[in-house]
Amino acid sequence: MKLPQLCHLAAVPLAFTLLSFNASAVSPPHPTGLDAPMISVSSMNANNYAPVETVKMFPAPKKGMVQHILTLPKLENETDYMVEIQIGQTQLVDCNKHGLNGQLKELTVEGWGYNYYQVDEISEGPSTMMACFELAKKEAFVQIPDELTLRYDSRLPKVFYLPEGAELRFRTWKADSTYQYSK
């Protein structure tokens, strides 16, 4: 392949990337400069619960529930970041689109005013009904319909109560662009 053709092939995706959506899912560099996960995660159930100083005001997990705690490190420009949360399960699925039923509730710690999130139960949800071959099954994350996008705020951990067997998946978004104005 000649160099001009190769440059043309590379220019089209590059132009599309530069001119499209101005926010991207990123894991910002860890504040220590190490190549480490930015958000630290801990989880406790009713059997191994031990109150931690930073989250002792939140209720202990009830039997059958798991408390997930996301601790965000302090960043210089936290207003440029958001945290996207998805709740679901990793399941063996066929070629159909699958979903789960469950309701994400935002609750408040009485007397403190701090928010936390809870899903009481998760059950099988809707699915398309295409004809699939049994051999085509693969593992995939199947989520409840509710998604949550939170402003990045390192002052207080994000606390979630989910049924045992549920997974909490998250990623950090950073705005790459400046504000546009309409007058």
Curated annotation (Swiss-Prot):
<comment type="subunit">
    <text>Homodimer.</text>
</comment>
<dbReference type="GO" id="GO:0004867">
    <property type="term" value="F:serine-type endopeptidase inhibitor activity"/>
</dbReference>
<keyword id="KW-0646">Protease inhibitor</keyword>
<dbReference type="InterPro" id="IPR023084">
    <property type="entry name" value="Prot_inh_ecotin_gammaproteobac"/>
</dbReference>
<dbReference type="InterPro" id="IPR036198">
    <property type="entry name" value="Ecotin_sf"/>
</dbReference>
<dbReference type="InterPro" id="IPR005658">
    <property type="entry name" value="Prot_inh_ecotin"/>
</dbReference>
<feature type="disulfide bond">
    <location>
        <begin position="95"/>
        <end position="132"/>
    </location>
</feature>
<dbReference type="Pfam" id="PF03974">
    <property type="entry name" value="Ecotin"/>
</dbReference>
<feature type="site" description="Reactive bond">
    <location>
        <begin position="129"/>
        <end position="130"/>
    </location>
</feature>
<keyword id="KW-1015">Disulfide bond</keyword>
<keyword id="KW-0574">Periplasm</keyword>
<keyword id="KW-0722">Serine protease inhibitor</keyword>
<feature type="signal peptide">
    <location>
        <begin position="1"/>
        <end position="25"/>
    </location>
</feature>
<dbReference type="GO" id="GO:0030288">
    <property type="term" value="C:outer membrane-bounded periplasmic space"/>
</dbReference>
<comment type="function">
    <text>General inhibitor of family S1 serine proteases.</text>
</comment>
<keyword id="KW-0732">Signal</keyword>
<protein>
    <recommendedName>
        <fullName>Ecotin</fullName>
    </recommendedName>
</protein>
<comment type="similarity">
    <text>Belongs to the protease inhibitor I11 (ecotin) family.</text>
</comment>
